[in-house]
Each structure stands twice: as C-alpha cells, then as structure tokens.
Amino acid sequence: MDKKKLSHSSLQSSVTSVLAALLCILIGLIVGFLVLLAINPAHAWGDGFVRILKGGFHDAPYGVGKELANAAPLVMTGLSVAFAFKTGLFNIGAAGQYTLGAYGALYCAIMLKMPWFVCLLAATLLGGIWGAIPGFFKAYFNINEVITSIMFNWIGLYLVNELVYQNGTGPMYDVRNTRTLNLSKNPAFAQSIIPDFGLNKMFQTNSTTIAIFLAAAVAILIWVVLNKTTFGYELKAVGLNKSAARYAGINEKKNIILSMARAGALAGFGAGLYYLSNVAQWNPLNSTSLPTMGFNGISVALLASSNPIGTIFSALFISHISVGGSFLSTKYYPTEISDLISGIIIYLCAFSMLFRGKIHGLLFKNADKTNVNAEPAPAKTETKKEGK
C-alpha cells in the first residue's frame, strides 16, 4: 500500500471517529433533555437544557474562565489515560498519580517556595514514579495494571492526606479552612502561581492562567511522540502485539514501564496545573473519595478515541457541560444532571466502534468498492535488445 492510500485510510478513520463522537454527544444531550422533562417539564428548556448548553457563557466572562481552568487538568488526565490506551494498557490509576502530583506541586510551592515551573516538574516526577510502579509489576510479574493501579489510587490518597494533615499540625495545613494554605493570599507564594498574562482580568477570575495553553502544547507534543518518533512506534507496537514486538527486538518490559511512567507523569502535571493555578486547595480530611479529575480523564480519553489532539476538545466539552450544570437552578433540578449527561455520553462511547463501523459503511462504502475493484497499475518492464 502506497503513501497516498495510507493517507486516505487515515483520513477516513479520523472522519468516522469525529462523527461517532458527535453522534454520542447528540444522543447524550437528547437523553439528558428527556430526563429534564421527566423531572420538571415546565422548566426543562430555558432553566435546564439551555443553561447546560450555554455552559460558562451563561455567566461570561467568569464562567468561561472557570471552564478553561477546569479543562486544563482534564486535558492532562485524558492524555494520561489515552497514552496508556495507545500502548495497550489501561491506566485507571490516573487519580492516584494526580494525587501524588498535587502533593509534589504544593510541597514545592508552600515549603520550598520554588518557581511555578519547578513545582510543575516536581508534580510530573512524583506522578511518573507512582505510575511506574504498576508498570513494573505488569512488566516483570504480569500483574494486571488495573488491579495494582486501583490499589495505588487509595494508597496515594491516604499517604498524601497524612503528609499534609499530620494530626492538624502539618506546616502545609490551614486549620481554619481545613485545607492546604491558599497560594494567592500569601505574597511569599506568588512565584509559585502559574502566570496569567492578563487572563484573570479578561475572565474576571483569579484562577484562569496559561495552564490551558500548556496543556494543549503537551497534547500536541504527545501526538508528535506517538506518531512521528521511533519511541512512539515501539510503544504502540508493544500495545498491538507483544510477541511480534519482542520478535522485532523491542524491549517489551522497558516499554511497559516507560508507558505507565509517562502516563503517570501526565496526570501529575495536570494536578500541578490545577493547584498552581489556585483553582482549589487540597482537603486532607476528604478521605473517602479520590479526585474526580483522574476518573474524568477516562471519559475524556474515550470521547476523544484516545487521540491526543482530540483530548483538548473533549476536555473542553466535558468542562463546558459541567460548568453549565453548576448554573442550573437548584429549585428545579439537581446540579448532578450534567454528570448524568456526561455519563450517558461516555457510556455511548463504549459503542463507538459500532458507530464508526456504521458511519464508515454509509460514507465510504462506494469509495472502498472502487479501491477494491480498481485494476493494479501495470508493472514497468525493461526489454533488452539482442545484439547480433
């Protein structure tokens, strides 16, 4: 198959993936509207569905800034899950890696008062280490990464809570607010906050920084690594067929560990973007639930079909309807309606292979037949003149 046919096939795959995702979103929104009708038909349209569709634009520019602030870590946790998916692994441990990344970023900011980019590096490093451990067990003991990742989610949560809280005497802990110290309220931490370059004034919020642009840049970088480098080829080869990769001389064990380490690093980086933008402070007393950003990353990756560039748009969409749900009037609807719609969309994404097959059949059926029935080009033959 020549390069032209490969490019054509890749374009068809991209088109069908995008259309399948849009179909999932459309069906999810329709089902969500029907739920709103069932709960309170009188306000289902204006006070319900329209507010969800408007998202942050319902209270612009503040709401839009809130969307961007929440989307940045979603892009990163989505990349974390998608990167592992591409290499044949299921990184359900993004929540734990995100937790360790949050601790690394906040420790460097509060205790060491380091610049924001150093704090981000610390978050990335700790997340990567936490991700590499399940990768090690998978590579050398063939222990399912899903099981070890889930266990390390909870280990990471309780470890970080104890390191921060320390029976209420931890130096990072604010007893009055029962959270870590607020970075924006202490000038000593100013250098640890990600710069906003005027975005805070534009969106009238103190948590909108360049984090979303950093996340988008990382997504593009991951796409390049996976599709344009030998390292990315080796990772995907191990994911597609370990035996064939081993036969080709690729170090299977090394690539499994590196894949999970990089997935963890991406999740940790996302936590750094979130907490160093001062969107929230860590609450060590919340010991019963893991950070939702880690699990929402699974939703982002599924909606994007594990495409690194697609995670940017799917994260923005998930953030959009989540913020829209927060603007619902609690007199008529619970704010969890947006989570319900997200859940329906993600559930439908599980059937995306079926949707892609149907869409491909409808759009490219005739084109495929033309390619199959086309006669191959005649081979060039050289004739030798016989000398007398």
Pin down the residues of each PLM region.
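Transmembrane helix-bundle core of multi-pass membrane transporters
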Residues: 153-226
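Membrane-interfacial amphipathic/re-entrant helices at transmembrane-helix boundaries
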Residues: 2-76
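Membrane-helix/interface signature in polytopic inner-membrane proteins
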Residues: 221-259
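Single transmembrane alpha-helix segments in multi-pass membrane proteins
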Residues: 36-37, 55-111, 124-143, 244, ...
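Transmembrane alpha-helical segments in multi-pass inner-membrane proteins
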Residues: 266-268, 273-343
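Transmembrane alpha-helices
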Residues: 214-218, 248-274
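Cytosolic-side transmembrane-helix boundaries in multi-pass membrane proteins
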Residues: 1-25, 38, 240, 247, ...
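Cytoplasmic juxtamembrane regions at transmembrane-helix boundaries
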Residues: 83-104, 226, 231-234, 329-334, ...
